[in-house]
């Protein structure tokens, strides 16, 4: 009788595994490895990537099951997939056959990295990922997305060693990210590996599980907005007025306009990656067309000659 009652209550058979799918997307393998090291438990390591795909899982312990109002007899697991993306799209097709959840239930984690991808491209990168996934029927507006900015401690190095970066730029960047996520009902996290005091793994788990129970619809106990490099702003906790407290002249609704992104890209200074990329193997060197290069050089010289002749005529 007890077994039948539990099965009816939870719409599952005892021993059946209830899964939540989380997809962690990044343009860089190194950033995914940083996320694994900084934000996951030691035993939650991604399997050796097959091409651009990694996998790990986490079985929910009993204390979480009690909060979720689930029977301890019900097995609950987070299936986490690490996916290397291109700049323009998320190749979700590689894991679609493995996903058991409805498209509207998948939890999306997008990784940005202060030491990798140029910060001025962040909004365009996110926009392209969102568009790519939404065109395939995935829901990225229903508390299902979070953006994790890894290695945010690098901000201090930029501020100290790069004369182009000023406090305004860091504030403008954060306000822009917060605004994008505010209108999508998403969450923002800055991960400072040197100073971090946020319970990153717990945040990740609860972001994955929040829609199982109303208790998970409030992560405000972890909210952190005051620290420059340690930020956690969960969905439903931000507002236009809060975003404007950083700089009241910033208008959050501007991020919804087509001309905001070009403005953002002009405002944010270029900063080269912390580690210069290695030269590609000889077999992967880009094609060099000598004739094309000579033709382009000839055009440039011809234009320069014309300008010089014109200048002499007008002396």
From Swiss-Prot:
Which of UniProt's keywords are assigned here? Cytoplasm, Cytoskeleton, Dynein, Microtubule, Motor protein
Location within or outside the cell? Cytoplasm, Cytoskeleton
**Chief location category:** cytoplasm
GO CC annotation terms, alphabetical: cytoplasm; dynein complex; microtubule
Protein origin, superkingdom: Eukaryota
Q: Does the keyword Cytoplasm apply?
A: yes
Keyword check for Iron:
no
Subunit field text:
The cytoplasmic dynein is composed of at least two heavy chains and a number of intermediate and light chains.
Q: Which family does it belong to?
A: Belongs to the dynein light intermediate chain DYN3 family.
Q: What does this protein do, in the record's words?
A: Component of the cytoplasmic dynein which acts as a motor for the intracellular retrograde motility of vesicles and organelles along microtubules. May play an important role in the proper orientation of the mitotic spindle into the budding daughter cell yeast. Probably required for normal progression of the cell cycle.
Full protein name: Cytoplasmic dynein intermediate light chain DYN3
């Amino acid at each position: 009788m007890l077994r039948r009652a539990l099965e009816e209550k939870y719409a599952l058979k005892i021993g059946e595994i209830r899964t939540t799918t989380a997809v962690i997307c990044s343009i860089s393998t190194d950033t995914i490895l940083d996320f694994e090291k900084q934000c996951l438990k030691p035993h939650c390591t991604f399997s050796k990537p097959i091409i651009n795909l990694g996998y790990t899982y986490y079985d929910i312990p009993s204390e979480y099951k009690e909060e979720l109002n689930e029977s301890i007899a019900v097995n609950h697991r987070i299936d986490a997939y690490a996916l290397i993306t291109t700049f323009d799209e998320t190749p979700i097709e590689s894991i679609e056959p493995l996903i058991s959840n409805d498209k509207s239930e998948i939890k999306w984690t997008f990784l940005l990295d202060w030491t990798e991808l140029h910060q001025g491209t962040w909004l365009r990168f996110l926009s392209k990922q969102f568009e790519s996934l939404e065109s395939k029927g995935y829901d990225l507006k229903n508390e299902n997305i979070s953006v994790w900015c890894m290695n945010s401690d690098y901000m201090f190095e930029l501020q100290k060693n790069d004369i182009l970066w000023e406090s305004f730029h860091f504030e403008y960047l954060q306000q822009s990210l917060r605004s994008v996520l505010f209108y999508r009902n998403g969450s923002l996290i800055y991960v400072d590996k040197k100073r971090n005091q946020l319970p990153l793994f717990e945040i990740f788990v609860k972001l994955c599980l929040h829609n199982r129970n109303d208790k998970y619809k409030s992560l405000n106990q972890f909210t952190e907005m005051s620290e420059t490099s340690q930020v956690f702003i969960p969905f439903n906790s931000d507002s236009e007025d809060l975003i404007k407290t950083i700089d009241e002249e910033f208008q959050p609704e501007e991020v919804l306009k087509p001309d905001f992104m070009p403005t953002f890209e002009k405002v944010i200074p270029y900063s080269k990656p912390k580690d210069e990329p290695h030269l590609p193997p000889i077999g992967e060197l880009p094609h060099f067309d000598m004739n094309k290069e000579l033709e382009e050089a000839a055009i440039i010289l011809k234009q320069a000659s014309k300008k010089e002749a014109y200048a002499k005529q007008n002396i």
